[in-house]
UniProtKB/Swiss-Prot annotation:
<feature type="binding site">
    <location>
        <position position="363"/>
    </location>
    <ligand>
        <name>UTP</name>
    </ligand>
</feature>
<dbReference type="GO" id="GO:0005524">
    <property type="term" value="F:ATP binding"/>
</dbReference>
<dbReference type="InterPro" id="IPR043519">
    <property type="entry name" value="NT_sf"/>
</dbReference>
<dbReference type="InterPro" id="IPR034388">
    <property type="entry name" value="Star-PAP_RRM"/>
</dbReference>
<feature type="binding site">
    <location>
        <position position="341"/>
    </location>
    <ligand>
        <name>UTP</name>
    </ligand>
</feature>
<dbReference type="Pfam" id="PF12874">
    <property type="entry name" value="zf-met"/>
</dbReference>
<dbReference type="GO" id="GO:0003730">
    <property type="term" value="F:mRNA 3'-UTR binding"/>
</dbReference>
<feature type="region of interest" description="Disordered">
    <location>
        <begin position="611"/>
        <end position="659"/>
    </location>
</feature>
<dbReference type="InterPro" id="IPR035979">
    <property type="entry name" value="RBD_domain_sf"/>
</dbReference>
<feature type="compositionally biased region" description="Basic and acidic residues">
    <location>
        <begin position="615"/>
        <end position="624"/>
    </location>
</feature>
<feature type="domain" description="PAP-associated">
    <location>
        <begin position="421"/>
        <end position="495"/>
    </location>
</feature>
<keyword id="KW-0507">mRNA processing</keyword>
<keyword id="KW-0067">ATP-binding</keyword>
<feature type="binding site">
    <location>
        <position position="319"/>
    </location>
    <ligand>
        <name>ATP</name>
    </ligand>
</feature>
<dbReference type="InterPro" id="IPR054708">
    <property type="entry name" value="MTPAP-like_central"/>
</dbReference>
<keyword id="KW-0863">Zinc-finger</keyword>
<feature type="binding site">
    <location>
        <position position="495"/>
    </location>
    <ligand>
        <name>UTP</name>
    </ligand>
</feature>
Length: 797
């Protein structure tokens, strides 16, 4: 057996540099290189290498630039498979193409511009393949052996007991809390010397009752009293002439800065100096004054702690007290949060900052648990508005003009009438979110129920216009940043705490909830195994196995393509219409998607309609016409239903098939149920292999076209030209491909999306599977691009 580059010979046998394991002899080595772990890492390394070769590094764009805008721009150079934004937002992005040749085409362009700014585009940095050390990750996370925990869980007699054991394994111990308290006292003493009357206030996981081993120590340096002290000192014109040298050195730090006028960056630099020079054991001090939330980071050697100090984070302190209150109101909250956090970490949904892509943070996950408990019947926890009404006058609180009022003590809140145990509630959590329509919903802990996405679709400017001019809370009028998952902070109501997530993470969370819900229905979850097998939480915490992953390709046999609802990527005019439509928004959006899908088939791919699109709408039998005002003048989107319901007639290519008429009427007249629109049906024919060789044709067109850097119609125009070139140059199919497409909008008890189901009716040449495979990625992206560009097209017309 010839050794490959990953295998190194040692005195005691062999060492696999890829898997970081020692192997005693050659037979064991042969087994190792054929094993699942080694083969998996080989595939993963090859995949990472391909991703690097097919990607470019992009910077220089505006901070509010969306993934959709970047994707649309770079689509003109090749098929974009993914756009990964940096976690701080607005600094850089990685644009991944389907082929490395597309990267060369992109880099060959002398200049790239987007939204008036010149982009910096360069090849993606090639990094040596390395798996993050588990030990390094664990020091920032749970620092427990899952094998050891599983052993303890299997000894438990019930799921309820297992959940309590999870809490005991993960929670901060009393000695850890005491160590943190001592460090807070030390910092208080030191900073009081320099900032008289200041306060060091701990917040976050260390004190919110959900702390984990080795979690960071978050601190808020409150300087309000110090500002008053400094103002008094100036007014009395006190001097330091009679002070000792040591006192003068300390006072000189404060005298060098006016806290009332100093910038946060200046104050943070001063905080960093004090930490470096005056606090024993502190090292690795770093002031991050340009971050979204300016902070000073530090480490303490002897205590093995990492800490953050902020100077303007009162809302976070109030959030911490809110979580403390919720834990005190009902003792079931803490065990559920610890269990669900560990489950989410094991499924790579949350907690692991080195994981793939943006993940749920622990705060967002905790709010999801609280919201679920607010929606039990009867509720386990009250809404924030209900808590506000239970507070007394002395407990009223407003921070940065946000109402943060709630009782200071749990005994002010009546106990819940809900008697469900932890086992049932955990099952209920997965059931609740497995059926949750994340794209069309906004989670509101303040209201205690879901808010429709249409309430947030108006632009900030429109919201400001409609806001009460006399309102003392202008921040309420600004809208939260919408995304695939929308979870409002209970107090800062324009902050989406899950705004960092992308569609992939939201889908993964929903999928894992569905899998967990199925498992929790089984006896393996509910009853202890009499044969000593894994049961209950042990199997629930198991990472997704390769066997489970291998079962996913079966779903590919279902000929379906989905277009997800992405309100953030829609043009402003359409967002305003959807907002006005309220609960009927799905019908309007469905019409837009169908119009875009028709344009992809009819204009971009040059498919021909063979019979009129038929709808099963409940219209008057004598005939009807449905008009939907969308205040836009898109070409070829005028679609009309006339004549008797169910009748068909041949259509010319120019007319195109459809069900709806989207006109420029000034008022809406709806003759069908837009809240639950009926399915649409198309039948198309295709006489050319328009899916074959598109990348090569696109590259050739970019090389020969004078408009390569700025195609007039963007990627939509370019894809149309690619199709036309294929139709003109390539041999046509001997027998035309004919296929049916059924379009249906779903939502409510599942994520809002348009599902397109395909049925090949004539496929003599056996090419439909290739065509469908091409459409799986091409059709949703092009439809979303067309809808996202609609406003620009209107402006140009």
């Amino acid at each position: 057996m010839e050794l490959d580059k990953d295998i190194q010979t040692t005195q005691k046998g062999f060492h696999c540099n890829l898997c970081h394991v020692n192997i005693p002899n050659r037979p064991s080595l042969e087994d190792h290189v054929k094993g699942k772990k080694h083969l998996h890492l080989l595939r993963l390394r090859a995949q990472r290498k391909t991703q690097e070769e097919n990607s470019v590094f992009v910077s220089g764009f505006k901070a509010d630039t969306s993934q959709t805008e970047l994707k649309e721009y770079f689509q003109q150079f090749g098929l974009v498979t993914d756009v990964i934004m940096d976690k701080q937002k607005g600094v850089y992005a990685i644009v991944e193409f389907s082929e490395s040749q597309d990267v060369q085409t992109t880099l060959a362009q002398p200049q790239h511009q987007l939204n008036g700014l010149k982009l910096r585009v360069k090849p993606r940095e090639k990094k040596e393949f390395k798996l993050a050390s588990r030990g390094k990750q664990d020091c920032k996370n749970t620092l427990i052996s899952l094998d050891k925990l599983n052993f303890e869980l299997c000894k438990a007699m019930s799921v309820n007991e297992q959940i309590q054991k999870v809490v005991e394994s993960l929670e901060l111990k009393d000695n850890e809390k005491k160590v943190r308290d001592l460090l807070v006292q030390l910092l208080q003493e030191v900073f009081t010397e320099f900032f008289p009357d200041c306060q060091i206030v701990p917040f976050g996981s260390s004190v919110n009752t959900f702390g984990l081993h080795s979690c960071d120590l978050d601190l808020f340096l409150d300087l309000e009293n110090t500002k008053v002290f400094q103002a008094r000192a100036k007014s009395s014109e006190q001097t330091g002439e009679n002070q000792s040298e040591d006192c003068r050195s300390e006072d000189s730090i404060l005298s060098d800065i006016d806290l009332s006028t100093a910038s946060p960056a200046e104050i943070l630099e001063l905080v960093a100096v004090i930490l470096r020079k005056c606090v024993p054991g502190v090292h690795k001090v770093q002031a991050l004054s340009t971050a979204r939330l300016p902070v000073v980071k530090f480490s303490h050697k002897e205590l093995n702690l990492q800490g953050d100090i902020t100077i303007n984070n009162r809302l976070a302190v109030r959030n911490t007290k809110f979580l403390q209150l919720c834990s005190g109101i009902d003792s079931r909250l803490r065990p559920l949060v610890y269990t669900i956090r560990l489950w989410a970490k094991q499924k790579q949904l949350a907690g692991n900052l080195s994981g793939p892509g943006p993940l749920l943070n622990n705060y967002a996950l905790t709010l999801l648990v609280i919201f679920f408990l607010q929606n039990r019947d009867p509720p386990v926890l009250p809404s924030v508005n209900q808590l506000k009404n239970m507070a007394c006058e002395e407990e009223e609180c407003a921070i940065e003009e946000w109402d943060c009022t709630f009782p200071s003590q749990p005994f002010s809140v009546p106990p819940s009438k809900n008697t469900e145990d932890l086992c049932t509630l955990l099952f209920g959590f997965f059931t609740f979110y497995s059926k949750f329509d994340f794209p069309a919903s906004v989670v509101s802990l303040r209201d205690g129920h879901v808010l429709p996405i249409t309430d947030f679709l108006k632009s900030d400017m429109e919201a400001l216009k409609t806001a009460d001019a006399s309102s003392p809370k202008p921040k309420r009028s600004s809208a939260p940043r919408l995304g695939p998952m929308n979870v409002l902070d209970p107090f800062e109501l324009n902050h989406n705490v899950a705004g960092n997530l992308n569609e992939r993470t939201q889908k993964n969370f929903k999928r894992e909830c569905c899998e967990a819900e199925k498992y929790c229905r089984s006896l393996q979850y509910q009853r202890k195994s009499a044969k000593g097998k894994s049961w209950g939480l042990v199997r629930l915490f198991a990472p997704q196995s390769e066997a489970a992953a291998s079962s996913q390709p079966r779903a590919e046999k279902v000929l379906e393509v989905s277009v997800p609802f992405k309100p953030a990527s829609l043009p402003e005019s359409l967002r305003a219409q959807l907002a006005s439509a309220g609960k009927d928004f799905r019908g309007l959006w469905f019409a837009e998607v169908c119009s875009a899908v028709q344009k992809v088939f009819n204009e971009i791919l040059q498919c021909s309609p063979t019979e009129e699109t038929q709808s099963l709408d409940k219209t008057d039998k004598s005939g009807s016409e449905m008009e939907v005002n969308n205040n836009r003048s898109l070409e070829d989107t005028n679609i009309q239903v006339k004549g008797e319901a169910g009748k068909k007639r041949p259509l010319s290519v120019e007319e195109g098939p459809s069900t709806f008429t989207i006109t420029q009427a000034k008022r809406q007249r709806l003759d069908v149920d837009l809240e639950h629109p009926e399915p649409l049906h198309w039948t198309w024919t295709q006489r050319s292999r328009v899916w074959a060789g598109r990348r090569k044709v696109r590259r050739d067109l970019l090389k020969t076209s004078d408009e390569a850097s700025k195609p007039e119609g963007g990627c939509v125009d370019m894809e149309s030209r690619v199709t036309q070139s294929i139709v003109e140059k390539e041999e046509k199919l001997h027998d035309a491909l004919e296929f049916k497409v059924d379009a249906e909008v779903v939502g409510g008890n599942e994520s809002t999306k348009v599902v397109l189901r395909f049925h090949p009716s004539i496929d003599t040449a056996g090419v439909f599977q290739d065509f469908f495979h091409f459409l799986e990625s091409f059709l949703p992206k092009m439809a979303e691009t067309i809808m996202g560009r609609a406003e620009d097209i209107t402006d140009m017309s």
